[in-house]
Amino acid sequence: MQTTANHSSRSTQTGTRAHGAALAETTSREDFRALATEHRVVPVIRKVLADSETPLSAYRKLAANRPGTFLLESAENGRSWSRWSFIGAGAPSALTVRDNAAAWLGTAPEGAPSGGDPLDALRATLDLLKTEAMAGLPPLSSGLVGFFAYDMVRRLERLPELAVDDLGLPDMLLLLATDIAAVDHHEGTITLIANAVNWNGTDERVDWAYDDAVARLDVMTKALGQPLTSAVATFSRPAPDHRAQRTMEEYTEIVDKLVGDIEAGEAFQVVPSQRFEMDTAADPLDVYRILRVTNPSPYMYLLNIPDADGGLDFSIVGSSPEALVTVKDGRATTHPIAGTRWRGATEEEDVLLEKELLADEKERAEHLMLVDLGRNDLGRVCRPGTVRVDDYSHIERYSHVMHLVSTVTGELAEDKTALDAVTACFPAGTLSGAPKVRAMELIEEVEKTRRGLYGGVVGYLDFAGNADFAIAIRTALMRNGTAYVQAGGGVVADSNGPYEYTEAANKARAVLNAIAAAATLAEP
């Protein structure tokens, strides 16, 4: 996820103890024993020079598309790449939902709850593994990485159940990320991290945990040293052969119905959507390769979601421009995005389009509504008087579009956590509408199928109390030879059905085009 944190480098003396709760370039047994007395999750690290590796080559060597692995990257404002890329090379377990209750896949941490409400189990797991932040580590060194589906909101709000659950996705799945490689683009290094999680604290158990972590580091180091077959490939850009869930006429009927609801005072804005499906033999990694070139965004991700037997259930490939919420050191931040123009062909055209967007009263009114919604969401979990709006309604340029963006921040209340901030903001107002609950009720009346991943979030909660979640848009779910992409847009009183249909199709196009192009990759 957002990978811009500027962490200072540490001593390069192997085995030396840095000041406080910090780690040197390599974790010694003595360092580990000292940290194990105070921490439930202890990272064992090894920093290696890897200036000839790319995030993709490192991912291919360390993760190789195995179930339970991931790749997270970030391109700031769709242009320059951020400092860090993160590769999840191993996850012994995942917290998910089965039979409407929390369940662990794989080997759960000792003492972790199972059964009951999934959010309660998640909260208890984060509390069980809570660990003081350690200086000198990359922004993501351990935690739970995965997704919340849009339909997780049914555990937060009472909604009608009218849409068909045809994909049967779990409401959430979060990988226990124990083995991580953090690629530092500034230094040309990779920090390999093997976490020891929740042992009983005896000397024998601590030594075993250290030896096990070092063995995993050895495996990762050896894998990085292996040569790869060439990743050079030719490709073409065919038009995607996809199926839309609804025709323009059917979608226009939905828009007209919602406009009537808005005129009747039911809501100010509602965000309907529709799904696009595409048969494909493309590798999810190849889709990611194309997408990161054609549509670089602040949140780029590839996750391979395991099933109950340890096989691959589905993959998530996305390039999202928008965060739901981030929490860092007790400060929660959300970035409402509303108001869009396509990028111009020249700088002069971009400037003219920016002026047009800033002068559009309708776009500015919708943006203000979502900023107010963000303030209200954070106000539920932040200390009174700390919620504020910064950089109100400024332009941010991305690879293909520009948006009106604001920043809303607040200090978490003492009795609130990063998970509380996520649930307070969930789902995003930009994907539901305002007032949020009534808008979701109206969405349930008009959409045929449950949204699943679309409008949910992809990201992580770490064990030091931080979180970073992107809204799951510009995202494909790939399962058993079919890719599912969903898109929509905000409907207000003067919305036009054919325009909204075209707008949804345009938003889905970047991902559909990437899938079509990925299927043509071939060795030259």
Curated annotation (Swiss-Prot):
It is an enzyme of class 4 (lyase). Residues 1-16 have a biased composition (Polar residues). GO terms for biological process: L-tryptophan biosynthetic process. Its cofactor is Mg(2+). Chorismate binds at residues 339-340, 454, 474, 488-490. The keyword Magnesium applies. Residues 1-25 are annotated as: Disordered. Its EC number is 4.1.3.27. Part of a heterotetrameric complex that catalyzes the two-step biosynthesis of anthranilate, an intermediate in the biosynthesis of L-tryptophan. In the first step, the glutamine-binding beta subunit (TrpG) of anthranilate synthase (AS) provides the glutamine amidotransferase activity which generates ammonia as a substrate that, along with chorismate, is used in the second step, catalyzed by the large alpha subunit of AS (TrpE) to produce anthranilate. In the absence of TrpG, TrpE can synthesize anthranilate directly from chorismate and high concentrations of ammonia. This is Anthranilate synthase component 1. The gene is trpE.
